[in-house]
Amino acid sequence: MTHAMHMTGGQALARQLALEGLRDIFCVPGVQLDWAVDGIREMGDAFRLLIPRHEQATSYMADGYARASGRIGVCMTVPGPGLTNAMAGLSTAYACSSPLLSITGQIHSSTIGAGYGMLHEIKGQSDLIGSVTKWHGLATAPNQVPGLVREAVTRLRSGRPQPVGIEIPHDVLSSAADIELVPPPLGADGRLAPAAEQVSAAAALLAHARFPVIHAGGGVLAADASAALETLAERLQAPVITTETSRGAISDLHPMAVNSVAGRALIRHADVVLVVGSRFMNRMAPSPQWTSATTQFIYLNVEAEAAAPPRKPGLLIQADARLGLEALARAVPAARTPRMGIVEAARGWAAQQIREVEPQFAYVQALRRAIPEDGFLINELTQVGYLSTIAYPLYHPRTLITPGYQGTLGFGFPTALGVAAAMPDRAVVCITGDGGFGWGMQELATARRYGLNMVVVVFNDGHFGNVRLLQQQTFGHTIGVELCNPDFSKLADAFGVRSAVASSPDEMESALRDALARGGPSLLEVRVGPMPSAWHLIGYNSIFKRPSPEPADPVADLLAP
């Protein structure tokens, strides 16, 4: 039990954050945040305040921090332009179900919505925050601050782990009152247990399935459910398809693990599909089109909306992914028919197609050889990056971090800084393009200032490469895709960051190994030319048409009745 103490709203914010165990904060300070930042200063070693050079990096860094560690990432910005600068990172965290707490300053509480032209005023700021959070709240008095933070953390630790936001006007932060902190409850983890009748019905479907398939999404990672996923897959002898944001939820060394290319060949034959922690949507079409008309579905998700149209109707288990998978593993009998041969045939068929995408495949292989098994790859939108989502082998959860369906250019480098801040003893490598790196190259200063242990690999082709590919295929010509780049080695040197240049996969591998061995921040420029598209393999056939691979169905004979 706590007792009321006389303090400012800024002090209350800092002390409640400390009580919640939220130590690391990514922030660009400003006048509306002065009392909050000073409250943090008073707490000394209770906090680590990391200051990037642009507010965009505050939310990206908090996202990377959260996704790598599973802990809550915290970013803090001034209102108006500070918030809008952070929106790209917030929208990415929302798309990728990242547990992020956004703290935003506000103009004087008496003038909100009045349109007086106050410093950093923005019309409808609360609505803007609401568009990229699952919950948000506003404090209008200092004594509301601890309860608002407590509610935000409760929301973050229950349900789908998307961002939440709180707004605190600067007069609320600077005003003093008798304020009581709100201790977190002991032993509460917020996990939703499955209903027994839902588990029984799903287990019966799976037990009688001729060929069950598991489609695992990012909710498996969020729930730390990898072990439970493997156990159920082994009992059912069911292949596990992972999505871009869930890769690593099951090790690629596991005999039941398949990437999405092999998965599309398998799922068309499934009579029962268990969808776990996934939106199960095609990014470029209104509904998934991968299964047969007779396929039955089980949706295991903490949100009921995950089973709603346009998805096909099915049985819903509304529960935490780990608890649901554990319950199913206890309820289903062990499969009598091994299916590893079927899975291996699909994997080989997919690997053959992936190997044909060069030179990207050679670069992906070089990355995997250079990065330790438990190292992190932060993957941005480059031609090498696109192929990496299906071709880069993963052995541990959370070790591939992507922008998900938001597809945010400029995501990679600042997000990797957050990963490095969260996991200082693990290798962190970001791959980005010369286009995307331009969004945040000033954060080389942040990497140097905090000695963050990471390498940014910049693939330099002098263009917005994917835009060029799309324009050329669609129109037969290009416009607005050429870039005027700096000398990246001189740029790195100006910030006091080591650099190297490579022009081949082997050179890149050697330079990357050296950079990782040295530790600290490094920039590695890889000079490349135009590359073919890999989009036909990652599900965007409506954009990039390619002939169907042969055989068109690699497992039909193995699954014949």
Tell where the protein language model's regions lie, with residue ranges:
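Phosphate/pyrophosphate-binding active-site segments
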Residues: 1-4, 143, 179-181, 293-381, ...
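N-terminal alpha/beta PP-like core and its mobile active-site loop of ThDP/TPP-dependent enzymes
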Residues: 2-332, 370-373, 453-456, 492, ...
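Active-site diphosphate/adenylate-binding microenvironment
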Residues: 10-14, 18-23, 31-41, 343-425
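Conserved structured core elements
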Residues: 30, 223, 264, 319-322, ...
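Thiamine diphosphate
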Residues: 111, 115-120, 267, 308-310, ...
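Short glycine/proline- and acidic residue-enriched helix-loop micro-motifs
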Residues: 131-138, 185, 343-357, 495
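Active-site-proximal loop/turn and secondary-structure-junction residues that shape catalytic pockets
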Residues: 170-172, 383, 528
